Amino acid sequence: MSSDGQAESRFSDFIDKLSLKIGGMVSYIWVVLLGVIVTNVILRYAFSEGRIELEELQWHLYSIGFLFGLSFALTTDSHIRVDILHEKFSPELRAWIELYGILLFLLPFCALVVLFGLPFVMSSYEVGEVSASPGGLPFRWLIKASLPVAFLLLAATAVARLLRTWSCLLYTSPSPRDAHESRMPSSA
């Protein structure tokens, strides 16, 4: 790490911008999901015709939106934490909790998901897995690939936040939340 935290800041800023860009693109999935749900409901109740592929598409779109929303939430600090306790702690204690939370919980969990997710995707690809439902969606490996990819992005976002938190502890000592907000890219 550099003595002034500049290298960490550049890396963190790059990852933040990437996460915000991907999160912005993926956010349109919610509009598409809404359209698919409305179409499926109209087909089912107005025309008595259920479409398996639309139902499966709903599940897949929701999964993609949720999975890629994790890194966006971490980048924008909009994830859930125990604020009742968190707000009572000193900025330095919050920074240490953030640092150890990322190191001991978030990064190992991301590593496990990627480690076990990649063979899951490869197996699906190798056998040409398709939906078991008649009329279901093909290329099941594609939706399964969103799991390790999204968790790789989440891990990169966590590392960026970890570096920023570490830099705050070493050089400036504000809370990581304050430092995070002051270094956030101005446009998504």
What name fits each language-model region?
Residues S175-D178, S182-A188:
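Positively charged, low-complexity/disordered segments
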Residues M1-S173, R177:
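Alpha-helical transmembrane segments and membrane-interface helix-loop junctions
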